[in-house]
């Protein structure tokens, strides 16, 4: 090339900052220049570009985290269906495989020191929670548990309610000494289990004589019911759709009390009477399987101990349990739960102003059976009696309905 022509090209800015292929390198572009290039892109086009950049470039992922992690509701998970002997350390060990944890806790019974059947996990980054939710059903200590966003609460649609009713089965005559994992291994042969077995005593960890399983598909439940009588270790177990229990009209669901607790309270997944106030109390009452009434609570988030920090519709009725007369479901109930105004202690208690009164949980729900349902071979509560002491209105649960 003539030297005079080359000098003129250089003076006009050509031939500078090339990447070897004759094109101008990106270092000459300012952020404003880049914005002008993409500002006419559609949302889908921008998402396509950004998702590839997040996966390929760690610095882009960190930038996205700075914005996404500010919403704790997308990082906090609720895990239900835990065994009585599941510990915080075990929960942390499992979920830390998905990402760095800010907090993990199994909620314990203050009397027995054992798991109440649920816990919370908060990830440091939203992508850790996202990975953990890819498979919501996780086998932990012989149980298939369910993981969900804590903020999602009880927000099932009508179609979801109908769908669950066709996937949930009730198993009667379960031997008291049959381990949960033995029962689970048998029923997993019919299809993928979403949750179960439910119904084991929270204190002893033993069967109460029945169990519940929720399959991921209705076909799995139907396969399990093709032969309604199962023989496991020489014992005959009777199976049916759990929803059928609402049609029988037989009085008296089983009302088994805590084995050896000596407190007269009914604990555990299946039996769902009012539970004693505990250290995780909230003004609206967190019913037996936890739950948030109303909108997000206005409590402080100053510490990492914020497992109860995201409010929503609650874990109440959607998985309501076997509420007998005056009883509340195990996954929720009328104002039942861990304390009302002035009750509870410890770092997880919410201020009374953070939640509306009145509880807000139906007596039973998609995982529950009506108080009129009856199954053979179970312990029945005598009509007109209750293992739970009645408290005058305005007593233990001043915001709840009468007799709570």
UniProtKB/Swiss-Prot annotation:
Domain RRM: 75-152, 167-248
InterPro entries: Nucleotide-bd_a/b_plait_sf, RBD_domain_sf, RNA-binding_reg, RRM2_NsCP33-like, RRM_dom
CDD domains: RRM2_NsCP33_like
Role according to the record: Heterogeneous nuclear ribonucleoprotein (hnRNP)-like protein that acts as a component of a complex regulating the turnover of mRNAs in the nucleus. Binds with high affinity to RNA molecules that contain U-rich sequences in 3'-UTRs. May function in complex with UBP1 and contribute to the stabilization of mRNAs in the nucleus.
GO CC term (a single one): nucleolus
PROSITE patterns assigned to the protein according to its UniProt record, in alphabetical order: RRM (PS50102)
Keywords: Nucleus, Repeat, RNA-binding
Domain of life: Eukaryota
Entry's induction text: By wounding.
Biological processes, Gene Ontology terms: cell death; defense response; ethylene biosynthetic process; leaf senescence
Region (Disordered), start-end ranges: 1-29, 246-270, 344-404
SUPFAM superfamilies membership: RNA-binding domain, RBD
Pfam family, one: RRM_1
Location(s), subcellular: Nucleus
One MF annotation (Gene Ontology) recorded for this entry: mRNA binding
The species this protein was found in: Arabidopsis thaliana
Protein name: UBP1-associated protein 2C
Tissue: Expressed in root apical and lateral meristems, young leaves and embryos.
Coiled-coil regions listed in the entry: none
Further information: Plants over-expressing UB2A1 display severe growth defects consisting of premature cell death and chlorosis.
Main location class: nucleus
């Amino acid at each position: 090339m003539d030297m005079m022509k080359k000098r003129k090209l250089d003076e006009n800015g050509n031939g500078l900052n090339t990447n070897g292929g004759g094109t101008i390198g990106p270092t000459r572009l300012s952020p404003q220049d880049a914005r002008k290039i993409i500002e006419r892109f559609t949302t889908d086009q921008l998402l396509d570009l950004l998702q590839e950049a997040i996966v390929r470039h760690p610095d882009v992922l960190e930038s996205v985290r700075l914005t996404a992690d500010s919403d704790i509701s997308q990082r906090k998970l609720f895990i239900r269906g835990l065994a009585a002997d599941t510990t915080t350390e075990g929960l942390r060990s499992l979920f830390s495989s998905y990402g760095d944890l800010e907090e993990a806790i199994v909620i314990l019974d203050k009397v027995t020191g054992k798991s109440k059947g649920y816990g919370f996990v908060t990830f440091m980054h939203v992508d850790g929670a996202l990975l953990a939710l890819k498979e919501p059903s996780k086998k932990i200590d012989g149980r298939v548990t369910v993981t969900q966003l804590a903020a999602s609460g009880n927000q099932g649609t009508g179609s979801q309610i109908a769908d669950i009713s066709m996937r949930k089965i009730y198993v009667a005559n379960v031997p008291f000494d049959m381990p949960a994992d033995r029962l689970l291994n048998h029923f997993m042969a019919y299809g993928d289990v979403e949750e179960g077995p439910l119904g084991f005593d929270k204190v002893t960890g033993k069967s109460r004589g029945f169990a519940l399983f929720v399959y991921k598909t209705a076909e799995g439940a139907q396969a399990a019911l093709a032969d309604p009588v199962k023989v496991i270790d020489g014992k005959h177990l009777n199976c049916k759709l759990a929803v059928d229990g609402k049609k029988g009209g037989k009085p008296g669901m089983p009302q088994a009390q805590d084995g050896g607790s000596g407190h007269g309270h009914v604990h555990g997944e299946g039996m769902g009477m009012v539970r004693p106030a505990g250290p995780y109390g909230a003004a609206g009452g967190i019913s037996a399987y936890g739950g948030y009434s109303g909108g997000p609570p206005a409590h402080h988030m100053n510490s990492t101990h914020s497992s109860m920090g995201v409010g929503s519709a609650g874990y109440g009725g959607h998985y309501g349990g076997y509420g007998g007369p005056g009883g509340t479901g195990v996954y929720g109930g009328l104002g039942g739960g861990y304390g009302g105004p002035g009750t509870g202690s410890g770092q997880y208690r919410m201020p009374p102003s953070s939640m509306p009164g009145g509880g807000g949980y139906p007596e039973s729900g998609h995982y529950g059976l009506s108080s009129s349902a009856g199954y053979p071979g179970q312990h029945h509560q005598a009509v007109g009696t209750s293992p739970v002491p009645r408290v005058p209105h305005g007593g233990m649960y001043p915001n709840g309905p009468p007799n709570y």
